[in-house]
Amino acid sequence: MTVRTRFAPSPTGYLHVGGARTALFSWAYARHFGGTFVLRIEDTDLERSTPEAVQAIIEGMEWLGLHHDEGPFYQMQRMDRYREVIGQMLAAGTAYHCYSSPEEVEAMRERQRAAGEKPRYDGTWRPEAGKTLPAIPEGRKPVVRFRNPTEGDVTWLDVVKGSITISNRELDDLVIARPDGTPTYNFCVAVDDSDMKITHVIRGDDHVNNTPRQINILQALGATLPHYGHLPMILGTDGEKLSKRHGAVSVMDYPAQGYLPEAMLNYLARLGWSHGDDEVFSMEQFTQWFDLDHLTKSPAQFNPEKLDWLNNHYIKQADNTRLAGLVRPMMEGLGAQFENAPDLAAVIALMKERVNTLNELAVAAMLFYRQPAADAALLAQHLTDAIRPALAQYVEQLKTVAWSKEALSATLKEVLAAHKLKMPQLAMPLRLLITGQLQTPSIDAVVELFGREVVLARLGKNL
């Protein structure tokens, strides 16, 4: 059997975190077995589906690197196929025309509720042997209903939840085509899964109630049933369902907030799946390890601090030139002055250890790309008359010293020893004069990156 999985979002909004996790698990399972990952856009909800949402979903998948092998397939482009199958089902007797009006169906359900029964279609127009159907109302267009079995159960072994059984008595004769002929959600999904030969359906557990309906339709079509796995929801840190109030829930919010895709993928992989105590792993490792046996049944909790920790790890591991390309546009928005400034990749190498996001990295790197504006009171506090002779000697020696971190460090120590000063006594005024800030990386590294010309110019103004 060739494994074929699918990710089938409805384009009614952004690609959210839960959807991205579903896509990741479906993608990884196909990759693990050398199978095929299909992208299908379920866009039959014409009132809510938008081209912008389709684009947002595709952009989110591309940012994460979850590349599909087939598709994207759009349900709205498959209407002829759905109508063909509906015609076949009507001819086979597995579907029928129903002329009950919406008002009649609602009245029927109200009577059932009043009697303490589960609301369901009562089968008025369902053909049965020896049954006389009502006269067709003049001018009324019918819906098409699926002839659901009235006896027995629907049972499947869910790869996450275990065995699930639903009585057919709990299921309705589902409307599979509206009066205008447009097919409905569960019918389209079943036909698509059959036509696309999907072997494994991995999706959120909000679809559990759809599964028995889709199974019955697939069986009526004589199709091979896929394996189903329903992932538990993702919760916020307060134990409630993840929502906007917990912060970013759209995947494309995360690059805007300075997260790397590899950090997001690593984090999503651990939301409901585990491989021993492994916390950090590449996507190559993940696809080698991933299986459905280690998916958890209980809801996963989204922890922003854990995501930050992973992002810090991947920022530290990332190529500095790549990071420079990502943070430069952010810094331009902050007013960075790149002319006659240090190499950005070199600055990032120095600054990236201390940050959790690219946004933080951009802010930190601005130290090297703006004019210093030290607070006058701080300057008066740290640049005292007792320090000025040492500063003057340091400036003089900077004019000829070899420009390396090691040589600069030796020069600074030599000046400190000559004037019997401790490191902070000279390093603090140097930081203020060169950067305008008291908190910087090692003063030797800062001096080296700024370069001889800039450092001498900024220090010379205060001699």
Swiss-Prot record:
Cell location: Cytoplasm
Entry annotated with the keyword Cell wall biogenesis/degradation: no
Record-level GO cellular component terms: cytosol
Pfam families recorded: Anticodon_2, tRNA-synt_1c
One Gene Ontology MF term: tRNA binding
Enzyme class: ligase
Comp. bias (Basic and acidic residues): 115-129
CDD domains per the UniProt record, alphabetical: GluRS_core (cd00808)
EC numbers on record: 6.1.1.17
Annotated positions binding ATP: 244
Region (Disordered): 115-136
Positions occupied by motif 'KMSKS' region: 241-245
Keywords: Aminoacyl-tRNA synthetase, ATP-binding, Cytoplasm, Ligase, Nucleotide-binding, Protein biosynthesis
Top-level division of the source organism's lineage: Bacteria
'HIGH' region (motif): residue ranges: 9-19
Catalytic activity: tRNA(Glu) + L-glutamate + ATP = L-glutamyl-tRNA(Glu) + AMP + diphosphate
Presence of keyword Cell inner membrane: no
GO biological process entries: glutamyl-tRNA aminoacylation
NCBIfam families: gltX_bact (TIGR00464)
Family from the record: Belongs to the class-I aminoacyl-tRNA synthetase family. Glutamate--tRNA ligase type 1 subfamily.
Function: Catalyzes the attachment of glutamate to tRNA(Glu) in a two-step reaction: glutamate is first activated by ATP to form Glu-AMP and then transferred to the acceptor end of tRNA(Glu).
Record text on subunit structure and interactions: Monomer.
Protein name, UniProt field: Glutamate--tRNA ligase
Species of origin: Janthinobacterium sp. (strain Marseille) (Minibacterium massiliensis)
Gene name of this polypeptide: gltX
